[in-house]
Swiss-Prot record:
SMART domains in alphabetical order: DnaJ (SM00271)
Gene Ontology MF terms in the entry: ATP binding; heat shock protein binding; unfolded protein binding; zinc ion binding
Function: Participates actively in the response to hyperosmotic and heat shock by preventing the aggregation of stress-denatured proteins and by disaggregating proteins, also in an autonomous, DnaK-independent fashion. Unfolded proteins bind initially to DnaJ; upon interaction with the DnaJ-bound protein, DnaK hydrolyzes its bound ATP, resulting in the formation of a stable complex. GrpE releases ADP from DnaK; ATP binding to DnaK triggers the release of the substrate protein, thus completing the reaction cycle.
Organism field: Lactococcus lactis subsp. cremoris (strain SK11)
Similarity remark: Belongs to the DnaJ family.
Cofactor binding, per record: Binds 2 Zn(2+) ions per monomer.
InterPro entries the UniProt entry points to: DnaJ, DnaJ_C, DnaJ_domain, DnaJ_domain_CS, HSP40/DnaJ_pept-bd, HSP_DnaJ_Cys-rich_dom, HSP_DnaJ_Cys-rich_dom_sf, J_dom_sf
Boundaries of every J domain copy: 5-69
GO CC annotation, single: cytoplasm
Swiss-Prot/TrEMBL CXXCXGXG motif repeat ranges: 154-161, 171-178, 197-204, 211-218
Keyword annotations: Chaperone, Cytoplasm, DNA replication, Metal-binding, Repeat, Stress response, Zinc, Zinc-finger
UniProt-recorded name of the protein: Chaperone protein DnaJ
Classification via CDD domains: DnaJ, DnaJ_C
C-alpha cells in the first residue's frame, strides 16, 4: 500500500502544510499544463497532479490517504458517518440493500452522502463569443483579434479575496475544519452530526477584511484579448474551442475554455453549400446558341469556360477544385456555373431585322409588331 505517491507527485513530504501543498500544486500544475507543455505524457502528468491535490487539499481525505492509501482517499475504508458504512461494499453501498436507511438518516441528520470538498480546485466557467466573417474570410481563413471580458484572479489580492496587507484567517467557528457539529432531536433521540460551516462555507478560512477591488470574491472582470486563427473552410454555426481562455478557476483550478462561434456573411455573387460553390451566370442568347468561351469569376480568380452551342437555361458546368477548402479532409470542393440565358429587351433596327431573318429561315412566323395581344390585357 503506497500512501506517499500523491506527495511525490507534488514534490512535498508527508508533513507539508496546506500552504506548501497549494504552492507546490500551482507549480506542478503550471509545469504540466497542456497549454504550456506540449511534451508527450504532459497531459497525463497534469491529471495526476490534479488528482493528488484534490485529495491532499482536503484534510479528511488526506487523513484517510495517509492511513489507507489511495483506497482510503476514494472511500474504500472508513470515513462513513456511522462506523464507516461506506466500506461495506458487500451490501451494495449507499445504493444497495440499505439505501432506505441512508434516506432516513439523511432526513434526520442533514446529510449522509459524499460531500464536495470546497477547497478542491475547480475549473472556471466556459465562455462563448461570436465572430462575424466575410464570405472570402471563411473560404481562405483569417486571423482575428477577439476582445471580451472574462473573470481573472484579482490583481490586488492575487485571488485570496483579502484586503491588501491581510490574509484569510482560520475560521473562528469551525477551527479550519470546514465542518461544525450540530445536535438535533430525532425520533431516535438526540444525535450529533456534522454539517458545512455556515461562516466559511466549508473552506476553513474566514476573510475578515475583504479586498476593496473584488470584495472578497478573489476574481475581477478584465478585458482580455486573444488571437484566433480561423481555419479555411469554416461555415456558419461551427465552433472552435480555445482551451484556457475562459473564466479563472477556483482554488487554483485551471481556466475554463472559450468557444468561438462563426457567423459567415452571404455573398452577393456566390452561393455556398459546404465545400461546393454555385455561381449563376447571365448569358446572351446568341452566345448560348452559337457557343462561346467566356470568363467566369471564382473565389480563386477568373477562369475560362467553353460554352457549347445550343446551351439552355439551367445547364450547369463544373469547375473542379474551384470551390471552398474541405475543412475535414484535403483539397477543395468544386464550383458549379449555372447558365441563365438573358433575352434582350431593347434592340435596334439592325438587330430586329437579323432576328426576323433568322425566324424566316427557321420557318417561324413572328408579327414583330410589339403590340399587346388580346390576352395580354389580362396579365
Amino acid at each position: 500500500m503506497n500512501n506517499t505517491e500523491y506527495y511525490e507527485r507534488l514534490g512535498v513530504d508527508k508533513n507539508a502544510s496546506q500552504d506548501e501543498i497549494k504552492k507546490a500544486y500551482r507549480k506542478m500544475s503550471k509545469k504540466y499544463h497542456p497549454d504550456l507543455n506540449k511534451e508527450e505524457g504532459a497531459e497525463d502528468k497534469y491529471k495526476e497532479v490534479q488528482e493528488a491535490y484534490e485529495t491532499l487539499s482536503d484534510e479528511q481525505k488526506r487523513a484517510a490517504y495517509d492511513q489507507y492509501g489511495e483506497a482510503g482517499a476514494n472511500g474504500g475504508f472508513g470515513g462513513g458517518g456511522f462506523g464507516g458504512a461506506s466500506g461495506f461494499s458487500g451490501f451494495g453501498g449507499a445504493s444497495g440493500g440499505f439505501g432506505g436507511f441512508e434516506d432516513i438518516f439523511s432526513s434526520f441528520f442533514g446529510g449522509g452522502g459524499a460531500q464536495v470538498n470546497p477547497n478542491a480546485p475547480r475549473q472556471g466557467d466556459d465562455l462563448q463569443y461570436r465572430i462575424n466573417l466575410k464570405f472570402e474570410e471563411a473560404i481562405f481563413g483569417v486571423e482575428k483579434q477577439v476582445k471580451y471580458n472574462r473573470e481573472e484572479l484579482c490583481h490586488t489580492c492575487d485571488g485570496s479575496g483579502a484586503k491588501a496587507g491581510t490574509h484569510p484567517e482560520t475560521c473562528h467557528k469551525c477551527g479550519g475544519r470546514g465542518q461544525i457539529n450540530v445536535v438535533r432531536d430525532t425520533p431516535l433521540g438526540r444525535m450529533q452530526t456534522q454539517t458545512t460551516c455556515d461562516v466559511c462555507h466549508g473552506t476553513g478560512k474566514e476573510i475578515k477584511e475583504k479586498c476593496t477591488t473584488c470584495h472578497g470574491s478573489g476574481h475581477e472582470k478584465v478585458a482580455h484579448t486573444v488571437k484566433v486563427t480561423v481555419p479555411a473552410g469554416v461555415e456558419t454555426g461551427q465552433k472552435m474551442r480555445l482551451q484556457g481562455q475562459g473564466d479563472a478557476g477556483v482554488n487554483g483550478g485551471p481556466y475554463g475554455d472559450l468557444y468561438v462561434v462563426f457567423q459567415v456573411e452571404a455573398s452577393d455573387k456566390f452561393e455556398r453549400d459546404g465545400a461546393e460553390i454555385y455561381y449563376k451566370m447571365p448569358m446572351d442568347f446568341v452566345q448560348a446558341a452559337l457557343g462561346d468561351e467566356v470568363e467566369v469569376p471564382t473565389v480563386h480568380g477568373n477562369v475560362k469556360l467553353k460554352i457549347p452551342a445550343g446551351t439552355q437555361t439551367g445547364a450547369n458546368f463544373r469547375l473542379k477544385g474551384k470551390g471552398a477548402p474541405k475543412l475535414r479532409g484535403s483539397g477543395n470542393g468544386d464550383q458549379y456555373v449555372i447558365i441563365n440565358i438573358v433575352t434582350p429587351k431593347n434592340m435596334n433596327q439592325a438587330q430586329k431585322e437579323a432576328l426576323q431573318a433568322f425566324a424566316k429561315a427557321s420557318g417561324i412566323e413572328v408579327s414583330g409588331s410589339g403590340k399587346k395581344g388580346f390576352f395580354d390585357k389580362f396579365k
